[in-house]
């Protein structure tokens, strides 16, 4: 699962299972 979102104004790209979207 490839998810692309913005963190602290930065573009972050992660490839993880849906249950690990809790990234801090």
Swiss-Prot record:
Its EC number is 1.2.5.2. Coiled coil: none annotated. Disulfide bonds: none annotated. GO terms for molecular function: 2 iron, 2 sulfur cluster binding; aldehyde dehydrogenase (quinone) activity; metal ion binding. Transmembrane segments: none annotated. Binds 2 [2Fe-2S] clusters per subunit. Keywords: 2Fe-2S, Iron, Iron-sulfur, Metal-binding, Oxidoreductase. Its cofactor is [2Fe-2S] cluster. It catalyses: an aldehyde + a quinone + H2O = a quinol + a carboxylate + H(+). Heterotrimer composed of an alpha, a beta and a gamma chain. This is Aldehyde dehydrogenase gamma chain. It comes from Comamonas testosteroni (Pseudomonas testosteroni).
């Amino acid at each position: 699962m490839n998810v692309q979102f913005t963190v602290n104004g930065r573009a972050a790209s992660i490839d993880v299972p849906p249950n690990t979207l809790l990234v801090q």
